């Protein structure tokens, strides 16, 4: 029986693909070597320990229907669209070795006519007249008895959108996370005009088979045709949840300030695991009572635009004479934290 397993996803859903990856990684026999090929529609994928409000322009993502997906590996934030090919190599220990999977990808690129090399811990670069350009980035995860290496290859990604979603709004964030480094990148289509996702997948598959001297039939998977993976529904529910994608952010502080016709407002939030642990309000308003009440209501609230807006509008019951001011405040807060 072959020790190899090859899975190719027909789904562009990042939560589905990452849930498949997680399930296979947890449940695979330690003797198995797995290659999983996939790609995501418009998504910002962040590292396990990153703060989405610091890394991403969450407001623009929401406006453009770009999803946020937190992966289980470390590293920085990346933007995925259908111009990216994603790969995941998994193996048990002691056989797991990320240099092997890196060499498989390099061999695949070489077979396609691209001479690339590893750079640093995570990147593959090609040499151009303008200098080295990154075409692939990777991240890794290891447990006691297994490990995986996953990454992306830039085929024909819309590089302008990279900056749209990975450059956050100028919010006053004092975060404990680390802002991702923006690398100089290029698409493989600049070197191989017309190259397709299918061609890249075929090249990686051939290099995978060649390295291990075995072949295996590909398992084509999609939400309508999921592999036999125990607990997949629970894993998908977690992967797609707000609690995982946003709520796992490291602790951070956020200052919002705005001047309205009735006075200036400063809101100071301390946030842990997606919940406001402390809220302070400062204002020169002649009627500070609604804002003081708001500070109390926001303690323990989810740091989510709709929840903050809901708490703000709940004050209308106690302060009906300030309806106009509270509705303006509510709209501003919701927009500021998106």
Curated annotation (Swiss-Prot):
Reactions catalysed, as given in the entry: L-lysyl-[lipoyl-carrier protein] + (R)-lipoate + ATP = N(6)-[(R)-lipoyl]-L-lysyl-[lipoyl-carrier protein] + AMP + diphosphate + H(+)
Major localisation: cytoplasm
Short name of any one Pfam family annotated for the protein: LplA-B_cat
Localization (cell): Cytoplasm
GO biological process, one term: protein modification process
GO annotations of cellular component type: cytosol
EC number annotated for this UniProt entry: 6.3.1.20
BPL/LPL catalytic domain residues: 29-216
Cited SUPFAM superfamilies: Class II aaRS and biotin synthetases, SufE/NifU
CDD domains: BPL_LplA_LipB
Pathway(s) this gene product operates in, as recorded in its UniProt entry: Protein modification; protein lipoylation via exogenous pathway; protein N(6)-(lipoyl)lysine from lipoate: step 1/2; Protein modification; protein lipoylation via exogenous pathway; protein N(6)-(lipoyl)lysine from lipoate: step 2/2
Protein residues bound to (R)-lipoate: 134
Top-level taxon in the UniProt lineage: Bacteria
Binding site for ATP: 71, 76-79, 134
PROSITE patterns: BPL_LPL_CATALYTIC (PS51733)
Alphabetical UniProt keywords: ATP-binding, Cytoplasm, Ligase, Nucleotide-binding
Subunit structure, as described in the record: Monomer.
PANTHER family registered for this protein in UniProt: LIPOATE-PROTEIN LIGASE, LIPOYLTRANSFERASE 1, MITOCHONDRIAL
Known function: Catalyzes both the ATP-dependent activation of exogenously supplied lipoate to lipoyl-AMP and the transfer of the activated lipoyl onto the lipoyl domains of lipoate-dependent enzymes.
General remark: In the transfer reaction, the free carboxyl group of lipoic acid is attached via an amide linkage to the epsilon-amino group of a specific lysine residue of lipoyl domains of lipoate-dependent enzymes.
Record-given protein name: Lipoate-protein ligase A
Organism: Escherichia coli (strain ATCC 8739 / DSM 1576 / NBRC 3972 / NCIMB 8545 / WDCM 00012 / Crooks)
